[in-house]
């Protein structure tokens, strides 16, 4: 049949059947070996043809029940194109047998061919015209409504597995057909006995090895052999299929699949006999399929008894071919495989077909197989206890993992089960970073925990650290995995890595643990700071009420603008002996302001700097008095009153003020402690960033003194800061004064520099009482110095912090702009300081101690910012001084407070500028 595979029925000369069959016989054995799919038509030995063909022809009974059963699986028919059968179940069933018979007939060339084609004709259409038997008409009719499926024509080679199954079911129908054809076969015809069938099967066996498709027939043949008489014809019929099938072993496998179908065989006796045989073979095949090799079993001696091992070998061959197809990912071949047993096929490692497809990365093949086999197979584990998803992770097949996790039930494996770890455990175990990254992203989207532990209490970080995969550890840490968890052995991941000798991983994990603990501490400190801020706010509210009460008293007593604590205050002239109380009270707000600034800075540095800055600005405005933004003049007046009157009222209010100041000092210490800690944590780096936001709050240019002091030495500033924080409000000021004196050197007053601009501003503003001015000046410088000291902490720590570079880059413009003028400004300021200090140094000292406290506390608010900016930006103290000076003058108009204060404070700032330039 090899040559005429695609012949038209008309072209076949049935009178020439003998020669035709001879040619096909010559080629068939080779073909069978080459192509299992074509074995049906070609794989029949000439000797077997005589018996088998006659028996087949004799057994031309039309199947009815089995045909129906078989119709469910309409495999691509194993018949040569000539035999294209209609899709009738009978036809389909008979097609395989008929095809086989046709081949046999043609090969036999004897009268068998003639009759058999008739049988085949109905089913296959190949034998239709030659049909000598009574069924030729049927064959013709079937040919007429026969529809050529491209699958049948083109996929014939691959039909073998499905066709085998089909042929198996067809075998029963074929048996019926054989009954019809018994008279037809002239050679063995009705006489064909089990012996003939056996001989045919044995003859066919050598070729059968290669054709699993025929195994169903073989199995049926063996069953038929049991029906030796009438069934003997069927047996022979079946035996030809055996011959063609060439897989005595496979029949067993298929018999397993088709046992039920054979049972449904209309011929009860046939079914009975077939069933025991098939069952025996099927079970035997399952148990011993691996035991027997088809070649050995194929020997002509093999008969029905030997068909079991033969079928097994055939089954093994089929399984092997399926495994190879899946390994290669040839999806086009899959449809031609028998689909019933796919889920039972495993390789030597316990891998099912899904394991194999996933491990090889054949995503399309995996999807197709999953649809055929069902998603339950995705839960099977191989000898390594890996599911297909786990095996895909082991082999780094990201696409397969992606599809299984996102599209199938394998998503359940993202969580640890009672007995098995999760997929990220496998990814960490096998070092698959890319897959781990995708899994973590997916788990984050799905809200699945990354810290689930396996039965040993190991998290994914533990597993990755035990196997030394640093990249996986880093990926897990980036996605927030917990590195401090302990497994059942009480080990952290870092300890596990150390125990396994992965020092690099353990070091990395130790660093991460340290950072985590620091971060937790920072969080705690932030909470504390927030609480303290709340306390401060309440204190500020109380102070505000107190100040408002003092307001009326303060306004009643006018005085020369002695205290230039704020630029506007220079113009305002209010002096009252009672104002001392106010000034003292005001000093507390100043301290609180400073504290609040620090607190807000540290807090904002940890969280959202900008948002917190705005909030802190609002709080500060409230603390300073809601009037700061609205009524700057009033506040300036108040500050003047407080400063001037501070000394007189100090004694009366000493006790409550001291208490408050102690409280404030304590708060301040806490704040500075937290600030220093945050600085070390590189949190302070954001302080400068936050300060620019506060420019609006910095209404007064006080930094002259601060800058001078900072110029002289940062160390002295540090000492002063420490003293400042440690000392209560009253003591603080004298320290700062001393420091400023020593630093200035020119004048006894700490505010030598600031005094000059202050005097100027006062003169243009009100031109009254110069002595008061100097006294005010020291007050202003002292606050400046305190603010500078406070600020100094942040810049110093900033130098150490990694973010200091960022700060410097941000403030670079300031540094560049003011670098040169710094020297000039320093000189003039020093000179001015010298002159003014000489004149009014004593008074300044005396009042500065009292007023200083008020001013310092008040000053730090504005000075703090400018100094923060300048210090953080320019790490040279010299630059800091001038940058602060100019910054204040330049920025004042821009700030919300500055606009109002500028009107009053402008003369001072302009005067200071002019003097600096002149010098």
From Swiss-Prot:
Q: What is this protein called?
A: Synphilin-1
Could you give a single Gene Ontology term from the biological process aspect? regulation of inclusion body assembly
Instruction: For the region Disordered, give the residue spans.
Output: 80-99, 108-140, 287-313, 549-615, 666-713, 728-919
Pfam families, alphabetically? Ank_2, SNCAIP_SNCA_bd
Instruction: Tell me, in a sentence or two, what this protein's role is.
Output: Isoform 2 inhibits the ubiquitin ligase activity of SIAH1 and inhibits proteasomal degradation of target proteins. Isoform 2 inhibits autoubiquitination and proteasomal degradation of SIAH1, and thereby increases cellular levels of SIAH. Isoform 2 modulates SNCA monoubiquitination by SIAH1.
Superkingdom, natural source: Eukaryota
Tell me what PTMs the record reports for this protein.
Answer: Ubiquitinated; mediated by SIAH1, SIAH2 or RNF19A and leading to its subsequent proteasomal degradation. In the absence of proteasomal degradation, ubiquitinated SNCAIP accumulates in cytoplasmic inclusion bodies. Isoform 2 is subject to limited ubiquitination that does not lead to proteasomal degradation.
* Quaternary structure, from the entry: Homodimer. Heterodimer of isoform 1 and isoform 2. Interacts with SIAH1, SIAH2, SNCA, RNF19A and PRKN. Isoform 2 has a strong tendency to form aggregates and can sequester isoform 1.
One GO cellular component term of this record is: synaptic vesicle
- The residue ranges flagged as biased composition, category Low complexity, are 555-571, 667-685, 774-785, 874-886
Compartments where located:
Cytoplasm
**Gene from which the chain derives:** SNCAIP
Query: Which organs or tissues contain this protein?
Result: Detected in brain (at protein level). Widely expressed, with highest levels in brain, heart and placenta.
Disease named in the record: Parkinson disease: A complex neurodegenerative disorder characterized by bradykinesia, resting tremor, muscular rigidity and postural instability. Additional features are characteristic postural abnormalities, dysautonomia, dystonic cramps, and dementia. The pathology of Parkinson disease involves the loss of dopaminergic neurons in the substantia nigra and the presence of Lewy bodies (intraneuronal accumulations of aggregated proteins), in surviving neurons in various areas of the brain.
* Entries under PANTHER family matching the protein: SYNPHILIN-1
The record's listing under InterPro entries reads: Ankyrin_rpt, Ankyrin_rpt-contain_sf, SNCAIP, SNCAIP_SNCA-bd
Alphabetically sorted, this entry's keywords are: ANK repeat, Coiled coil, Cytoplasm, Neurodegeneration, Parkinson disease, Parkinsonism, Repeat, Ubl conjugation
Respond yes or no to whether keyword Coiled coil is given for this record: yes
**Family matches, as SUPFAM superfamilies:** Ankyrin repeat (SSF48403)
């Amino acid at each position: 049949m090899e040559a005429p595979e695609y012949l038209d029925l008309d072209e076949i000369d049935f009178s020439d059947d003998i020669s035709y069959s001879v040619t096909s016989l010559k080629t068939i054995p080779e073909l069978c070996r080459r192509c299992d799919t074509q074995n049906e038509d070609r794989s029949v030995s000439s000797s077997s043809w005589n018996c088998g063909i006659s028996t087949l022809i004799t057994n031309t009974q039309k199947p009815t029940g089995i045909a129906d059963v078989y119709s469910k699986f309409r495999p691509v028919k194993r018949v040569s194109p000539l035999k294209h059968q209609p899709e009738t179940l009978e036809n389909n069933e008979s097609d395989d047998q008929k095809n086989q018979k046709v081949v046999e007939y043609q090969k036999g060339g004897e009268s068998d061919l003639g009759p058999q084609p008739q049988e085949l004709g109905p089913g296959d259409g190949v034998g239709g015209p030659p049909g000598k038997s009574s069924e030729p008409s049927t064959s013709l009719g079937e040919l007429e409504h026969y529809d050529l499926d491209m699958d049948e024509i083109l996929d014939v080679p691959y039909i073998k597995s499905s066709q085998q199954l089909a042929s198996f079911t067809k075998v029963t129908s074929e048996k019926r057909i054989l009954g019809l054809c018994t008279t037809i076969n002239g050679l063995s015809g009705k006489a064909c006995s089990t012996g003939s069938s056996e001989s045919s099967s044995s003859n066919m066996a050598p070729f059968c090895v290669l054709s699993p498709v025929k195994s169903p027939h073989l199995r049926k043949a063996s069953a038929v052999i049991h029906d030796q008489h009438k069934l003997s014809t069927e047996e022979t019929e079946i035996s030809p299929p055996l011959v063609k099938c060439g897989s005595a072993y496979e029949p067993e496998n298929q018999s397993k699949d088709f046992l039920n179908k054979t049972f449904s065989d209309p011929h009860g006796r046939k079914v009975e006999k077939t069933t025991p045989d098939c069952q025996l073979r099927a079970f035997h095949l399952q148990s011993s399929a691996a035991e027997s090799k088809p070649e050995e079993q194929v020997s002509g001696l093999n008969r029905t008894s030997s068909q079991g091992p033969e079928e097994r070998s055939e089954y093994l061959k089929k399984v092997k071919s399926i495994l190879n197809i899946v390994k290669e990912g040839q999806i086009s071949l899959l449809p031609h495989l028998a689909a019933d047993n796919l889920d039972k096929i495993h390789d030597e490692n316990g891998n099912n077909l899904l394991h194999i497809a996933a491990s090889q990365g054949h995503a399309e093949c995996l999807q197709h197989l999953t649809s055929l086999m069902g998603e339950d197979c995705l839960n099977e584990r191989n000898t390594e206890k890996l599911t297909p998803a786990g095996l895909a992770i082991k082999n780094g097949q990201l696409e397969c993992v992606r599809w299984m996790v996102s599209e199938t039930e394998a998503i359940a494996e993202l969580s640890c089960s009672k007995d098995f770890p999760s997929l990220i455990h496998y990814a960490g175990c096998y070092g698959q970073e890319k897959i781990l990254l995708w899994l973590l992203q997916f788990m984050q989207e799905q809200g699945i925990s990354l810290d689930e532990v396996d039965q040993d209490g190991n998290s994914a970080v533990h597993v990755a650290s035990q196997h030394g995969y640093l990249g996986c550890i880093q990926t897990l840490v980036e996605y927030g995995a917990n590195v401090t968890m302990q497994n059942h052995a009480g080990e952290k991941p870092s300890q596990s890595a150390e125990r396994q000798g992965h020092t690099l991983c353990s070091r990395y994990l130790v660093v991460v643990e340290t950072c985590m603990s620091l971060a937790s501490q920072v969080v705690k400190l932030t909470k504390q700071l927030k609480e303290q801020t709340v306390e401060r706010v309440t204190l500020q509210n109380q102070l505000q009420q107190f100040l408002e009460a003092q307001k009326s008293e303060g306004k009643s007593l006018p005085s020369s603008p002695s205290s230039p604590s704020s630029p506007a205050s220079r113009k305002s002239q209010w002096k009252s002996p009672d104002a001392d109380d106010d000034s003292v009270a005001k000093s507390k707000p100043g301290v609180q302001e400073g504290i609040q600034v620090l607190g807000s800075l540290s807090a904002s540095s940890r969280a959202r700097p900008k948002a917190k800055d705005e909030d802190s600005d609002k709080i500060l405005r409230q603390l300073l008095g809601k009037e700061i933004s609205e009524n700057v003049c009033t506040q300036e007046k108040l500050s003047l009153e407080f400063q001037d009157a501070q000394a007189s009222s100090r004694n009366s209010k000493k006790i409550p003020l001291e208490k408050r100041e102690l409280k404030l000092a304590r708060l301040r210490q806490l704040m500075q402690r937290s600030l220093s800690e945050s600085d070390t944590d590189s949190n302070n780096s954001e302080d400068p960033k936050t300060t620019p936001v506060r420019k609006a709050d910095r209404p007064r240019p006080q930094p002259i003194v601060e800058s001078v002091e900072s110029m002289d030495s940062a160390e002295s500033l540090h000492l002063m800061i420490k003293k400042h924080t440690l000392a209560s409000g009253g003591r603080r000021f004298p320290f700062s004064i001393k420091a400023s004196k020593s630093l200035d050197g020119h004048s006894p007053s700490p505010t030598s520099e600031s005094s000059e601009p202050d005097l100027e501003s006062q003169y243009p503003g009100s031109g009254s009482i110069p002595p008061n001015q100097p006294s005010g000046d020291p007050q202003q410088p002292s606050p400046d110095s305190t603010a500078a000291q406070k600020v100094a902490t942040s810049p110093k720590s900033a130098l150490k912090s990694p973010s200091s570079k960022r700060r410097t880059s941000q403030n670079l413009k300031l540094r560049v702009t003011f670098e040169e003028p710094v020297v000039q400004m320093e000189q003039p300021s020093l000179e001015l300081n010298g002159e003014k200090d000489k004149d009014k140094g004593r008074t300044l000292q005396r009042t500065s101690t009292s007023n200083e406290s008020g001013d310092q506390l008040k000053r730090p608010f504005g000075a703090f910012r400018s100094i923060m900016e300048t210090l953080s930006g320019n790490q040279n103290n010299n630059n800091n001084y001038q940058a602060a000076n100019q910054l204040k003058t330049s920025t004042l108009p821009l700030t919300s407070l500055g606009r109002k204060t500028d009107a009053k404070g402008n003369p001072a700032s302009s005067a200071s500028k002019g003097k600096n330039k002149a010098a």
